A protein has these predicted regions:
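Non-heme Fe(II)/2-oxoglutarate
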Residues: 3, 9-106
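Short, motif-level signal for alpha-helix interfacial/capping segments enriched in acidic residues
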Residues: 1-7, 114-116
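Catalytic core of non-heme Fe(II) oxygenases with the double-stranded beta-helix
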Residues: 84-99, 103-160
């Protein structure tokens, strides 16, 4: 349980510019390889301009409602689902770890929320240089968001 070990021993709390946490080394090397090998389109090859969202299809949420394939956004991210979990065995283990009582209680204590009736939605995203994300609340049911960055090429940690 790599994530839980990191939550217990490698977590820093920050209050500026808002309360957030930094968890160091929450993934195994195998999981990192699985993420870096995921087949996701590189947005630089799609001739798209970053607009502060991951939608990248020129429309807001209302524009995309009813588009079952997610529009262009779907091509630039990959959700780990029951149907494709065999392609992501290590990320599937991470989902199970996030669903474990020990982990969701630990995270809940950090953020001050009861996560006992929550769901995990894990996606692999190909954010590239120049990407930025507006603060947002995309669905009211969302209790928290977390982002784990994989930096295999020693890019600057000050990019965003």
């Amino acid at each position: 349980m790599e994530l839980f070990k990191s939550l217990e021993t490698k977590t820093k709390n920050f209050n500026d510019p808002f309360q957030h946490f930094e968890i160091n080394k929450p993934l195994t090397e195998e999981t990192i390889k699985e993420i870096s090998n995921a087949e996701i389109a590189d947005p630089r090859n799609e001739n798209l301009k970053y607009d502060g969202t991951r939608a990248l299809d020129g429309g807001d949420g209302a524009f995309r409602s009813g588009i079952k394939d997610g529009g262009k956004a779907k091509k630039l991210r990959c959700y780990v689902t029951k149907e494709n979990s065999n392609q992501f065995p290590n990320l599937t283990k991470l989902i199970e770890e996030l669903r474990s009582e020990k982990v969701y209680k630990k995270i809940g204590s950090l953020i001050g929320k009861n996560l006992s009736n929550s769901y995990v939605r894990l996606e692999v995203i190909c954010d590239r240089e120049g990407f930025w994300l507006k603060p947002h609340c995309d669905i009211k049911e969302k209790l928290m968001s977390s982002i784990i960055f994989i930096n295999l090429h020693n890019e600057s940690k000050n990019l965003g």
